[in-house]
Amino acid sequence: MAECSGLQFVSPYAFEAMQKVDVVRLAALSDPELRLLLPCLVRMALCAPADQSQSWAQDKKLILRLLSGVEAVNSIVALLSVDFHALEQDASKEQQLRHKLGGGSGESILVSQLQHGLTLEFEHSDSPRRLRLVLSELLAIMNKVSESNGEFFLKSSELFESPVYLEEAADVLCILQAELPSLLPIVDVAEALLHVKNGAWFLCLLVANVPDSFNEVCRGLIKNGERQDEESVGGRRRTEALRHLCKMNPSQALRVRGMVVEECHLPGLGVALTLDHTKNESSDDGVSDLVCFVSGLLLGTNAKVRTWFGTFIRNGQQRKRDNISSVLWQMRRQLLLELMGILPTVRSTHIVEEADVDTEPNVSVYSGLKEEHVVKASALLRLYCALMGIAGLKPTDEEAEQLLQLMTSRPPATPAGVRFVSLSFCMLLAFSTLVSTPEQEQLMVMWLSWMIKEEAYFESISGVSASFGEMLLLVAMYFHSNQLSAIIDLVCSTLGMKIVIKPSSLSRMKTIFTQEIFTEQVVTAHAVRVPVTGSLSANITGFLPIHCIYQLLRSRSFTKHKVSIKDWIYRQLCETTTPLHPQLLPLIDVYINSILTPASKSNPEATNQPVTEQEILNVFQGLTGGENTRPAQRYSITTQLLVLYYVLSYEEALLANTKILAAMQRKPKSYSSALMDQIPIKYLIRQAQGLQQELGGLHSALLRLLATNYPHLCIVEDWICEEQITGTDALLRRMLLTTIAKNHSPKQLQEAFSMLPGNHTQLMQILEHLTLLSAGELIPYAEVLTSNMNCLLNAGVPRRILQTVNKLWMVLNTVMPRRLWVMTVNALQPSVKIVRQQKYTQNDLMIDPLIVLRCDQRVHRSPPLMDITLHMLNGYLLASKAYLNAHLKETAEQDIRPSQNNAMGPETPEVTREELKNALLAAQDSAAVQILLEICLPTEEEKAQSSSTYSLLKSVQSTTSPKSSDVEEEEDSLLCNLREVQCLICCLLHQMYIADPNIVKLVHFQGYPCELLALTVAGIPSMHICLDFIPELIAQPELEKQIFAIQLLSFLCIQYALPKSLSVARLAINVMGTLLTVLTQSKRYAFFMPTLPCLVSFCQAFPPLYEDIMSLLIQIGQVCASDVATQTRDFDPIITRLQQLKERPNEVSGLCKDSPYKSCSRDITSVDPDVQLCQCVESTIIEIINMSVSGV
């Protein structure tokens, strides 16, 4: 708005005085300044104040005295004397009339019969008419604005353009707005004033006379403004008006700028206000407000703001660049001045060339960047990156030259200096077009050479672990491996912004790096000499040596140039702490891959060396003693977990690549089992579980490796037990820990065990105290506990001691399971073996898990110790599977050698070995099950002691009669132990059956004593799966298997009365009927005598089978009777009774206890087998009838 250039605006001093009603400051104003504020001051002096205080009364007197000498006050007083109510009514009528006429000019109610022009009319009019003239003109403009639909127009108005009457028109405008606020909202008036000449001046006067409306007016103008103000006349006028307002009230300029960003309107205004603010602020060495503001817009998180401002930059570049009046040009000029203001003074290429000859290498003739300018220089670089990369700014030649001068300057060795060099380097990569001449390219190469030479010095002086040297090395490696996308990601990450970089733009930089500065051999040799990062953790950000080593390992540079990297990696693993750095696990994985697989087939020996066993053991020294020795440990838990991850991953990868390595005739060394036995794997996993948040994905990776290679350490029961041991209850109990409990030594525990036959109290007391210790603190007592377990098998040891030992063993099992199992198995050997000193190793037990069951027979009747034995058996069965799988993979070369001359192809040997392994595992599992089932049988001694013990196996649901004598109490105890052991075994068998249903089928096809069927069916919930294969078992040719199948089915039908059971029972009845017709006399007796009682169970479970079963029984009786009839006719009465039983069961049911039926089973052994079978049939029918009649 150049038309306002000759007018006097309200000064910031005067506006502040009006805001604060500072009468003293107002009195100090000059007459021209005071003239602009008269409307408000006169109203203030004449209107009744709300403030009735004495101080305001004094101030009001000063204001009246101030106004008394001003001539224009009289005209303003006359304006205030008008009837504004009538004026408002007339204005409302005119508005309604204009609305009816469609906005046409028409006849005005406010002003009628204008004799002359508006200016002359205003001059000759009195105060009321002047008010009407201005109001009519203002309402007309406001109506036109509301009808314009956002299109800007400039309204010609004599009243607002005549320089003679501007002040009087402004007085009238201010009075009208103050007296008629509902008719003339100040925001609408402000919007209308933008459309007239001198509108900005009128707007400033209006706001100055209503200072409280400043923020409201500014927000309204911004909200109604254009998204891009530089593109239109209206936008530029709006920006200029708001800029004048902010000059009048500079304290609110930044708040107005915030409104601009919030609304995403008028970007030029935001920049202009920032430029005004930058000129006013003191010129210090810090980052300017302009740099901060523009950086915040382009690098902030609000994508809408970023797009809006980027559009402003792009549109501004499309206009003429020499348009000095544009805000964008002013911004670029200011930024360039700031950039040039911090540049070093001496910057000449030829000086450097002379320096290379005449000066020492450590002396630089460059004027380095001043330390106080480094942060500002970094901020400017990032801003220019954002302007060029995000907003699309195309730098001028001057800007490009100055930017390159700044980027290749040399900062001091401080953390900020390291950051500046990193930013400069990434900016060179991102915007290689800044280097356009050979001289500039030479300057860049020299600067890069200086970076290489100085990076170690910078790192040592600045104390920053992430130096720019690692970034240089990393970029060089990426260029050598042609990973241009990785370089782009690196640049964007360092600059902190996502910008588009074309890979083709990096071609020249790639040539410079790979041929002039960093050859691959130089990169590799330099990388291995880079010191490891001390206390490496995720808290250390930036690009570190580990990133460089990782990339070199991936590209196989170390093996290609025969550089050993093993020691560097080992040192770095030893220098780690929590939180875990995310690059460590990928580094270990790629290192393992470089050990096992050569870089090329032509050179199979080109691999890295693995970490030695002694180096691995060094990391875990002092750990086997438990938690009480942790302070003496040399290495952190992070290092130990990483080395454990390395060992487990190495072994897994070695097994996975066995075939490939065998084909290449390579066999890398595997770590010995002795080494693995010395690593406390479970203890370390427990430690990792408590540090999951700090270890990132390491804990889950270790669990995966453990489940694959050490399934016996991932038993579900162990995890559940561990939750109980480490839970709240255990923590509360540990709070009861006394000094006495802590003072018990393993030696005292041994002495207490030695006193066992006579004194139980001391041992019980020590064991109870030990239960309060944590798992790690119990480790020193493990050997004493296990070595004395054999003593606990003697008679008279209290059950409480056994249970406490079991509890302590389970706690120790959470931290040292493998060593604990070996010690326990050796301790529970029979006495004869202990004398021979036959000690089993971990390897022995994995090869033959059944060793666990070759323990002292007394263990089989000690439930707490049997629980431990079963736990170990389950673990070693799982370990044996993993061991055999690993062994199969380790010996894969045996598959390859024969297959080379085998016409059958390479698959045949592998399938055979796999089948052999599966057969061995099946035999092993089934043998374990058969031994456990045998343990469930009562011994001859137990049978002799109590007949009720044996009857328990017949019926699980039967209850024992109460005993009264003291001798029977001992039998009851024996029965209780046997029952408890049976329950423990059934629980384990259930788990094994669920884990592998094939075991169930194999065991039942092998068969076991029928006395155990009642126990297994009732005690093992998964026995119902036997229904799937019973038809196949019945179809076997062996008579014993058929009998066993029918007996098993009878118990299953009672336990699981399902439709499937019914169908299988029908099949069994049909098979029995078929066999009746084909079996010889001896086989018929052998088959039907044990299976006939099963028919009672079928009938009990499924009453619909009654008719079929009765028919079968009659058929059996008839067949047997026919054989007897050939010898004698005395058998007819039995056949007659059988027919009566079938035809009239209700009549006979009451007589079942009479002598004819009661004597049917007597003297069975003294008669012919057919007679015995007939009597058994009769007994079975009677039992079925009794059952059906009684409703059982």
From Swiss-Prot:
Pfam families per the UniProt record, alphabetical: INTS2
Spans through the membrane: 420-436
Keyword Cytoplasm: yes
Keyword set includes Transmembrane: yes
Recorded topology in the membrane: Single-pass membrane protein
Keywords, comma-separated and alphabetical: Cytoplasm, Membrane, Nucleus, Transmembrane, Transmembrane helix
A Gene Ontology cellular-component term: cytoplasm
A biological process term (GO) from this entry: snRNA 3'-end processing
Localization: Nucleus; Nucleus membrane; Cytoplasm
Domain of life the protein comes from: Eukaryota
InterPro entries in UniProt: Int2_metazoa, INTS2
Subunit: Component of the Integrator complex, composed of core subunits INTS1, INTS2, INTS3, INTS4, INTS5, INTS6, INTS7, INTS8, INTS9/RC74, INTS10, INTS11/CPSF3L, INTS12, INTS13, INTS14 and INTS15. The core complex associates with protein phosphatase 2A subunits PPP2CA and PPP2R1A, to form the Integrator-PP2A (INTAC) complex.
Family stated for the protein in its record: Belongs to the Integrator subunit 2 family.
PANTHER family: INTEGRATOR COMPLEX SUBUNIT 2
Protein name: Integrator complex subunit 2
Protein's organism: Gallus gallus (Chicken)
